[in-house]
Amino acid sequence: MIVGKIGFGWASMAKSPVDDDIDMRALKAFLAVLDNGGMAAAAGALGLTQSAVSQAVARLEKSLDVDLIDRVRRPPVATAAGEALAERARRVLADFSDLADGLRHAGNQARPRVRLGLIDSVAGTIGAPLIRAIRADVREVSVWSGISPTLGRDLAGGRLDLIVSSNPSMAAGHKPKRLLREPFIAVLPKSLRHRPDIVDPIRMAERLPLVRYSVRSVIGEDIERDLVRRGRVPPRVFEFDGTDGVFAMVAEGLGWAVTTPLCLVHGRMYADDLVAVPLSGPVVSREIFLLAANVVGAGLAANVRHAAIALLTARVSGDITRLAPDAVRHIRVG
């Protein structure tokens, strides 16, 4: 409720000084009675009950200790004091309206424009709700999605303000804040007979081609590094930049893939044709970080991180638990 004090330039109007705050809504009700020719019409114009309008005007008269409306006449008209109040009240309400508009405009100008970069697995899983969560903090937001190397270069080059990336070293000078650590897992065609409970990549590659993520991406590099560590790298047959291409091939039974639980949620349109299985050997994980340019306020960066962590936590307890239950115990959010 907006309240304010109104002073008057005549001594005879009130028996005592005006000490009470005047409700701006009561002023609007009073003016509506004058403008619409009665309590009932004013109530209709304001979307209130006639009783509410009558009580508002009565409170205003009590606050000022003066009659504002001549209720004997039909339609009711303002008394001399009411006419004086009406003239000043219109100016006051107009000033308040201008002030509110100015404050809203100033608030919009104070909020930043934000350019946000998201790796595909994040954009496709929590991207939209993340933007919704921070919408009140920004005046304008633009989102780029892509692979970590590209996003890192764009952050370093000043073309992005915030990125969610799986390789913080690609944006040197920006302190990373971890959002997620998740294990690599295997995805197999549901149509594959005699599916193993744990996948040995070398043996599985002897049964089906490995559908790779491109080494242009960080996830592709990480998977390739783990295959080299295992001592034998499967032959290159299929390679894609993104999860959709990888999962489409596996769903058709053309191969199998190494991926992560979040990528599995990203490619959930293929979930009915895929099975997630743990990989053999030590657990190998990837990490996802938030990196912010120096021009981004600490408060905004913290809000983005908190929102992302909350959304990722919900994904783990929901989709990931359903699609890759064996992976959940190896996942750390935040």
Residue ranges and their predicted role:
Residues 173-211:
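Flexible hinge/capping segments at coil-to-helix
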Residues 111-171, 325:
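Central regulatory/effector-binding core of bacterial HTH transcription factors
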Residues 31-49:
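Short helix-boundary/capping micro-motifs
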Residues 63-64, 85-107:
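Alpha-helical linker/hinge and terminal dimerization helices associated
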Residues 61-80:
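A short LG(V/I)-centered, amphipathic sequence patch enriched
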Residues 194-196, 209-231, 298-309, 313-324:
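Secondary-structure junction motif
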Residues 150, 159, 166, 216-277, ...:
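Hydrophobic hinge/microswitch elements
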Residues 1-20, 136, 261-273, 281-334:
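C-terminal effector-binding regulatory domain of bacterial HTH transcription factors
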